[in-house]
Amino acid sequence: METFLFTSESVNEGHPDKLCDQVSDAILDACLEQDPESKVACETCTKTNMVMVFGEITTKAKVDYEKIVRDTCRGIGFTSADVGLDADHCKVLVNIEQQSPDIAQGVHGHLTKKPEEIGAGDQGHMFGYATDETPELMPLTHVLATQLGAKLTEVRKNKTCPWLRPDGKTQVTVEYKNDNGAMVPIRVHTVLISTQHDEGVTNEQIAQDLKEHVIKPVIPAKYLDENTIFHLNPSGRFVIGGPHGDAGLTGRKIIIDTYGGWGAHGEGAFSGKDPTKVDRSGAYIVRQAAKSVVAAGLARRCIVQVSYAIGVAEPLSVFVDTYKTGTIPDKDILALIKENFDFRPGMIAINLDLLRGGNFRYQKTAAYGHFGRDEADFTWETVKALKPKA
């Protein structure tokens, strides 16, 4: 049997880039909660003892940016300089301006356009992907790497592993076979975890706890064997982490946010962007389309691309490829997608309820992936019934 290896990585919520994603989306939540018509393009950067938010926001909401920054950092676990950042005493810098009136008139006519007329906030192309290799219809490498990161945070916060600190990275290599275009996982080849830790814990304790409390609960036993390789804190020391260890910036973990290197990516990041930004809303609708194709049994694997021009409501193109796993021709699947999904940005926002913020709705997406999540707020994960014409 001919097989191949494929690898996906993830980072958990204490990674400095992910901290920035969460701050940007927490600000988006606050704006949309008070004013669903908010236009938000919020970036965040961080380094030792400093977090800065900057960008363009037009909103009627009254937003305390500094409080949101501190609350978000504190919620992650950055409560002292020792762990990488002190949420209550770090410098918070804010440089927020209003959206360019040139963009505003072209996209939403200064709020005079009907939802179906609202143009894309920028040009670009977005991809959605789905595969039948997991119940989530997501790549196994990505699912496992992401879940390992989430479990690291869980056992840190519930004190199962009190030596853990917020920053951490995971990576999983899976051996696959190609079944006529579909991906079939055979086994987990390698597991890599690098996690920030307290000064006093030994490397032996770290390895033991990671295997028992993180790896075993996450990776199904059927994928592990005596040949599986484990690299657990292979650098030997990871005490300095978070923004103290590395600078962070919104939008630098776009592959982790999506499909772990599978499918394709149109390069636009998600966090800190309201639904008129098709980098986000376009990627959400094509994920729903691709997932619906696979869930309907029309293909075992599917990628969908959509593209836009700034200020234009209708997409420029829609493309589908089922990697030769389709039960009907790709052109017929494309016709079904076009019949069942409205790719106009204003209608995506309505149909996926994307104008609703607050209650951590968008902040939740900013760590542990935007796709494959079984939560009501992830409306784009809801499958549409697709039936080919007789």
UniProtKB/Swiss-Prot annotation:
<keyword id="KW-0554">One-carbon metabolism</keyword>
<keyword id="KW-0547">Nucleotide-binding</keyword>
<keyword id="KW-0479">Metal-binding</keyword>
<dbReference type="Pfam" id="PF02773">
    <property type="entry name" value="S-AdoMet_synt_C"/>
</dbReference>
<keyword id="KW-0808">Transferase</keyword>
<feature type="binding site" description="in other chain">
    <location>
        <position position="99"/>
    </location>
    <ligand>
        <name>L-methionine</name>
    </ligand>
</feature>
<dbReference type="GO" id="GO:0005829">
    <property type="term" value="C:cytosol"/>
</dbReference>
<dbReference type="Pfam" id="PF00438">
    <property type="entry name" value="S-AdoMet_synt_N"/>
</dbReference>
<keyword id="KW-0460">Magnesium</keyword>
<comment type="subunit">
    <text>Homotetramer.</text>
</comment>
<dbReference type="GO" id="GO:0004478">
    <property type="term" value="F:methionine adenosyltransferase activity"/>
</dbReference>
<feature type="binding site" description="in other chain">
    <location>
        <begin position="235"/>
        <end position="238"/>
    </location>
    <ligand>
        <name>ATP</name>
    </ligand>
</feature>
<dbReference type="InterPro" id="IPR002133">
    <property type="entry name" value="S-AdoMet_synthetase"/>
</dbReference>
<feature type="binding site" description="in other chain">
    <location>
        <position position="246"/>
    </location>
    <ligand>
        <name>ATP</name>
    </ligand>
</feature>
<feature type="binding site">
    <location>
        <position position="9"/>
    </location>
    <ligand>
        <name>Mg(2+)</name>
    </ligand>
</feature>
<dbReference type="InterPro" id="IPR022629">
    <property type="entry name" value="S-AdoMet_synt_central"/>
</dbReference>
<dbReference type="InterPro" id="IPR022630">
    <property type="entry name" value="S-AdoMet_synt_C"/>
</dbReference>
<dbReference type="GO" id="GO:0005524">
    <property type="term" value="F:ATP binding"/>
</dbReference>
<feature type="binding site">
    <location>
        <position position="277"/>
    </location>
    <ligand>
        <name>ATP</name>
    </ligand>
</feature>
<comment type="function">
    <text>Catalyzes the formation of S-adenosylmethionine from methionine and ATP. The reaction comprises two steps that are both catalyzed by the same enzyme: formation of S-adenosylmethionine (AdoMet) and triphosphate, and subsequent hydrolysis of the triphosphate.</text>
</comment>
<keyword id="KW-0630">Potassium</keyword>
<dbReference type="GO" id="GO:0006730">
    <property type="term" value="P:one-carbon metabolic process"/>
</dbReference>
<feature type="binding site" description="in other chain">
    <location>
        <begin position="252"/>
        <end position="253"/>
    </location>
    <ligand>
        <name>ATP</name>
    </ligand>
</feature>
<feature type="binding site">
    <location>
        <position position="273"/>
    </location>
    <ligand>
        <name>ATP</name>
    </ligand>
</feature>
<dbReference type="GO" id="GO:0046872">
    <property type="term" value="F:metal ion binding"/>
</dbReference>
<feature type="binding site">
    <location>
        <position position="269"/>
    </location>
    <ligand>
        <name>ATP</name>
    </ligand>
</feature>
<feature type="binding site" description="in other chain">
    <location>
        <position position="277"/>
    </location>
    <ligand>
        <name>L-methionine</name>
    </ligand>
</feature>
<dbReference type="InterPro" id="IPR022628">
    <property type="entry name" value="S-AdoMet_synt_N"/>
</dbReference>
<feature type="binding site" description="in other chain">
    <location>
        <begin position="167"/>
        <end position="169"/>
    </location>
    <ligand>
        <name>ATP</name>
    </ligand>
</feature>
<feature type="binding site" description="in other chain">
    <location>
        <position position="56"/>
    </location>
    <ligand>
        <name>L-methionine</name>
    </ligand>
</feature>
<feature type="binding site">
    <location>
        <position position="43"/>
    </location>
    <ligand>
        <name>K(+)</name>
    </ligand>
</feature>
<dbReference type="Pfam" id="PF02772">
    <property type="entry name" value="S-AdoMet_synt_M"/>
</dbReference>
<feature type="binding site">
    <location>
        <position position="246"/>
    </location>
    <ligand>
        <name>L-methionine</name>
    </ligand>
</feature>
<keyword id="KW-0170">Cobalt</keyword>
<comment type="similarity">
    <text>Belongs to the AdoMet synthase family.</text>
</comment>
<comment type="pathway">
    <text>Amino-acid biosynthesis; S-adenosyl-L-methionine biosynthesis; S-adenosyl-L-methionine from L-methionine: step 1/1.</text>
</comment>
<protein>
    <recommendedName>
        <fullName>S-adenosylmethionine synthase 2</fullName>
        <ecNumber>2.5.1.6</ecNumber>
    </recommendedName>
</protein>
<dbReference type="InterPro" id="IPR022631">
    <property type="entry name" value="ADOMET_SYNTHASE_CS"/>
</dbReference>
<dbReference type="GO" id="GO:0006556">
    <property type="term" value="P:S-adenosylmethionine biosynthetic process"/>
</dbReference>
<keyword id="KW-0963">Cytoplasm</keyword>
<keyword id="KW-0067">ATP-binding</keyword>
<dbReference type="InterPro" id="IPR022636">
    <property type="entry name" value="S-AdoMet_synthetase_sfam"/>
</dbReference>
